[in-house]
Amino acid sequence: MSTAREVFSSVDQGETWEAIGIKSRWPLPYARGLAVKSDNPDVLYAGCGETTTGMNGHVLRTTDYGANWETLKLPVQPNATIWGLSTHPADANRILAFSLFGEVYMSDDAGESWHKIEREFGEIRTAVWLPNL
């Protein structure tokens, strides 16, 4: 679960929640979207930024359920906070990340490399993949 300044995890089906402490682990303090890798629940992706609209954003990845995070290198600096992410249900290595102000980045290798989609949109709030497309 993501709130403005923290990410929480639960190991008991949501009965209790524990903060993972992003202030000491993330390069920017504002937490936004989360996505889980469809074939490995230990791998999570997160979007962050300076503030809600922010002039800066990052995509982060953890491979140990949030204990450690790495910043993934995007081809250009996003124009705003990375607002959300979407993992493809049929291709676990395919991920979309998008900024609040319309930039879209795609990875076909689980976040190892990214390319920016040429077309930009207005404010993007969410994105989903259809499993058979």
Regions found by a protein language model. Give the residues of each.
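Extracellular glycan-interacting surfaces
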Residues: 1-133
